[in-house]
Each structure stands twice: as C-alpha cells, then as structure tokens.
Amino acid sequence: MSAATDEILEKLKSLTLLEASELVKQIEEAFGVSAAAPSGGMMMMAPGAAAPGAAAAEPEEEKTEFDVILEEVPGDKKIAILKVVRGITGLGLKEAKDMVESTPKPIKEGTGKEDAEDIKKKLEEAGAKVSVK
C-alpha cells in the first residue's frame, strides 16, 4: 500500500461510530452511490460460506484419494516387505530398499479407497506397520 492509503486507513480506524455514519452519508452524496444492502430479500453469501446450522446438516464430503504410508519395518521382516513394496510400486531393488529403510515413507499416493486398503493389507501381512491417510 502507498503512504496515502495507509494514512487514510489509520484515520478510518480511529473514527467513532457516529463519525463513520456521517462519512458514509457524505460518500453516498459525493459519488452518487448507495451503501445499502441489495434488496433481494435474501443476503448474498461469499462462496464457501454456509448459513448457521447448515454445516451440521450437510454430510462431510467423502474422501476419494488416499495415501498409503509405510510407518515401520521390523528388521526380521524387511525382505518380505521389500518384495511387497517392489510389487506395489514397480521400483527397482535399490529404490525399493531405500524406501523401506527410510520410514515413515509414502508407498502409494492419491489412490482409491479399495486399492489403499488392499495395499495396506498386503504390507501388514508381510509384517509392516502401515497407515492410510
């Protein structure tokens, strides 16, 4: 903002309610505008704003994309988990090994619910701790 607009803003902040009301009247007269709300019988709302109580009535949108996160890999289960990770991701041995050794690490991102649950099940069967977010 410029110094002039900053100065005006500071002066507006210091006005009393009566002074602000007088200012509105003067602006309406000087510029030929009206500060009155549109008379449509209904208030306009900003996009995304909800009427009070409406949020409770509307069901929350169901999440459609999930991330499967490899949280923990027990040392004795590392090879089995590595095989599952390679099968899921299609990564080479070195890349999959790096992924398994650097937990927590996302294994699959933006996948569907069923696919995410299937991946989680496979990894847990191999001995890994997995979360779906």
From Swiss-Prot:
SUPFAM superfamilies: ClpS-like, Ribosomal protein L7/12, oligomerisation (N-terminal) domain
InterPro entries: Ribosomal_bL12, Ribosomal_bL12_C, Ribosomal_bL12_C/ClpS-like, Ribosomal_bL12_oligo, Ribosomal_bL12_oligo_N_sf
GO cellular component, one term: cytosolic large ribosomal subunit
Residues forming coiled coils: none
GO biological process, one term: translation
A Pfam family assignment: Ribosomal_L12_N
Keyword Transcription: no
UniProt keyword annotations, A-Z: Ribonucleoprotein, Ribosomal protein
Domain of life from the UniProt record: Bacteria
Gene Ontology MF term list: mRNA binding; structural constituent of ribosome
Annotated region (Disordered), positions in chain: 98-118
NCBIfam families for this protein: L12
Subunit-structure text: Homodimer. Part of the ribosomal stalk of the 50S ribosomal subunit. Forms a multimeric L10(L12)X complex, where L10 forms an elongated spine to which 2 to 4 L12 dimers bind in a sequential fashion. Binds GTP-bound translation factors.
Family statement: Belongs to the bacterial ribosomal protein bL12 family.
Entry function: Forms part of the ribosomal stalk which helps the ribosome interact with GTP-bound translation factors. Is thus essential for accurate translation.
Full protein name: Large ribosomal subunit protein bL12
Origin species: Crocosphaera subtropica (strain ATCC 51142 / BH68) (Cyanothece sp. (strain ATCC 51142))
